[in-house]
């Protein structure tokens, strides 16, 4: 029987993506919402700090090993914003569309050559709430920000993140291509490999 692992997210898009990406880890993955665990307050100043806050929070509430990620969009012309504030860029209760609207407004008039950006992801695994040696993996996906939304797949900033060499936005990529290329896919591949080593898989 596979060991259970709690996934520290209530974001439906992220849960769906991570369940696919970590499915080879040898663990049975349970979203924290299924266990009645509320979202942790993300008070960290970095992606690593926020990912650890979420993972330890889920482990403490569930008594299970936990995995969490923190990720965001860094836009060169905005000095790296929205960064760790990506999910709340337009305010605490902002929707994906609200955040995209604010981003496009901030980049209004910025020419294509200055719209470089990257998605960054830090993914962590803690064995329990007292784990002093968490596993940490990172991924980075370079691209640039388009002037309009394109595509209906994915979530977050995917409709305005243009993927080099494809002519597509992240929201237009087939899921298997996105999982292979993305920041989250990169981090998950590293972490899944380490988890398989832990479980002997």
Curated annotation (Swiss-Prot):
InterPro entries: dITP/XTP_pyrophosphatase, ITPase-like_fam, RdgB/HAM1. Belongs to the HAM1 NTPase family. It holds the Pfam family Ham1p_like. It comes from the Bacteria. GO terms for molecular function: dITP diphosphatase activity; ITP diphosphatase activity; metal ion binding; nucleotide binding; ribonucleoside triphosphate phosphatase activity; XTP diphosphatase activity. It catalyses: XTP + H2O = XMP + diphosphate + H(+); dITP + H2O = dIMP + diphosphate + H(+); ITP + H2O = IMP + diphosphate + H(+). It comes from Methylococcus capsulatus (strain ATCC 33009 / NCIMB 11132 / Bath). PANTHER family: INOSINE TRIPHOSPHATE PYROPHOSPHATASE (PTHR11067:SF9), INOSINE TRIPHOSPHATE PYROPHOSPHATASE/HAM1 PROTEIN (PTHR11067). The active site is at residue 70. Its EC number is 3.6.1.66. Keywords: Hydrolase, Magnesium, Metal-binding, Nucleotide metabolism, Nucleotide-binding. This is dITP/XTP pyrophosphatase. The lineage of its organism: Bacteria, Pseudomonadati, Pseudomonadota, Gammaproteobacteria, Methylococcales. Coiled coil: none annotated. One of its GO terms (biological process) is nucleotide metabolic process. Its cofactor is Mg(2+). GO terms for cellular component: cytosol. The keyword Metal-binding applies. Pyrophosphatase that catalyzes the hydrolysis of nucleoside triphosphates to their monophosphate derivatives, with a high preference for the non-canonical purine nucleotides XTP (xanthosine triphosphate), dITP (deoxyinosine triphosphate) and ITP. Seems to function as a house-cleaning enzyme that removes non-canonical purine nucleotides from the nucleotide pool, thus preventing their incorporation into DNA/RNA and avoiding chromosomal lesions. Mg(2+) binds at residues 41, 70. Homodimer. Substrate binds at residues 9-14, 71, 155-158, 178, 183-184. HAMAP family: Non_canon_purine_NTPase. The keyword NADP does not apply. Binds 1 Mg(2+) ion per subunit.
């Amino acid at each position: 029987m596979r060991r259970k692992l709690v996934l520290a997210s209530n974001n439906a898009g992220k849960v769906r993506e991570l369940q696919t990406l970590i499915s080879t880890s040898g663990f049975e993955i349970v979203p924290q919402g299924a266990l009645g665990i509320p979202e942790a307050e993300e008070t960290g100043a970095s992606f690593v700090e926020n990912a650890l806050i979420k993972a330890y929070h889920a482990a403490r509430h569930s008594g299970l090993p936990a995995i969490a990620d923190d990720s965001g969009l860094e836009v060169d012309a905005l000095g790296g914003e929205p960064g760790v504030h990506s999910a709340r860029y337009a305010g605490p209760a902002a929707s994906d569309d609200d955040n995209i609207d604010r981003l496009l407004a901030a980049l209004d008039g910025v020419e294509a050559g200055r719209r470089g950006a990257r998605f960054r992801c830090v993914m962590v695994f803690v064995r329990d709430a007292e784990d002093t040696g968490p596993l940490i993996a990172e991924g980075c996906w370079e691209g640039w920000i388009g002037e309009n939304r394109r595509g209906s797949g994915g979530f977050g900033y995917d409709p305005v993140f243009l993927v080099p060499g494809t002519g597509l936005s992240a929201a237009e990529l087939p899921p298997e291509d996105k999982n292979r290329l993305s920041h989250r896919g990169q981090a998950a591949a590293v972490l899944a490999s380490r988890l398989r080593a832990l479980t002997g898989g």
